[in-house]
Amino acid sequence: TLSLHDALPILQTRDFEGIAFVNLVDFDMLYGHRRDVAGYAAAATEFDRFLADFLPGMREGDLLMITADHGCDPSYTKTTDHTREYVPYLVCGKGVKAGMDLGTKLCFGTIAKTICEYLEVDASTLDGKSVWQEIRA
């Protein structure tokens, strides 16, 4: 298994068609469920620095989506279970409008349909509504 630092630079230097999925599991396993606020903050800061280096290398046609499968507030100490925050859905690339606010209406079906429309894959059997036409530049 490659780390984030190993995997994403490879994606920027190799041509391929399709989708690459990277799971940043440490945010959840090492910091969120362990209620390690300082570790979570350090990991978020490291990820921010990584993005600052990664984003300028995105090519025409590249699309980056960042989201989460659930909340996991490291400062909530009553339980180590998932917490109930809204999760982010950040989309960027040269073909995406900047500064769009899609609100809180999104679900995984929306994300799946958006990916399918972007990749020109039939998604007629999936739930959700694509937001690709709203966000494309």
Task: Please place each PLM-identified region on the residue numbering.
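Feature captures the catalytic ectodomains and active-site-proximal regions of enzymes
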Residues: 1-137
